[in-house]
Every structure is written in structure tokens, then in C-alpha cells.
Amino acid sequence: MATRSTISLKVSESDKGKVFHFDENKLPYNLSCENKCIDKMGDVKIEKDYLTIFHHWDGYPHGVGKTLVNKFKNYNSILNLLCGGDASSINGKRIVQYCAWRGDEWDDNYGGVQPKQSDTEPSVTEEYAYLFKDGKWFFKGYEVEEWTDLKEYLETHTDEE
């Protein structure tokens, strides 16, 4: 289902000013990605406090939220994921970046699929927003208006609620 979300990371101060590049070999749990997109991904120079990508499919807590908690458990794996840019889906065994389907190129004039950067904490711009901060996943959206511990929420709510 096209329940859209955003995925954000509170950037470590030590990473500001550094340049990162998506690396398929650093994906957790034997995940792969749409190979058509890898050569289109550019470098990401971190200049602000938060990185955010758009995620198109299954953005609800028991969809992408569950994937984030179960597969993207540490800062470096999340940073690598976000350096891959906007995604159609990270659920399942294959990550499909947005540019794989749209043919978008990363260059100096087009940043449409690169992670967005901000100095302010992300707000909800889609149905759900996810944030990795202080070693934990948080979310807000339809069910909750304030940042809520995602793992605790998943442990206490079924996907049928």
C-alpha cells in the first residue's frame, strides 16, 4: 500500500563535514539493492544535524517501522541507507531506490533523490515519520502526535489495530 513516510537520522557531530557514499556491501542481513541505481548515487556531504529520505511504500509502523527496528539497528547502517537516497521500498530482501524506477541522476543541478539535510528536528510531512536518535528508533504519525519509541510501540500494538 502506498503509505508514505520519511526516515531520518540525527547526525553525529563527528560526521559533519565528511563525505559519505552508499555502499551496497554495508547493507544488513543480506539485503541487496536495485543495481540500476548504484552508479547514479552521488556523494553525500553532511553539513547539517539531520538527514532525511522519503519512503513510498508500506510506511506504517508494522511495515517500514518494523523493518527499521529489525534490520537497521545501528547508526552506521542507517547512515548508509540514507546515503542511498529516497526509496520506493526497503521492505523485503531488496531495497528499491527511487531513482531505479524514475531514472533520476544525481548531479550538481538535481538533488531530488538525495537525502535532505536540516538543522531542525524533522516534522511529519507524510503519513509517518521515523527518526533514529540516541541509539533508538522513534516515530510519529496517525497513531501518535509526539515522538514515540518505535520498538516499544511494536511490542504493545498489533498490526491489526
What kind of region is each of these model predictions?
Residues 67-161:
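Low-complexity intrinsically disordered segments
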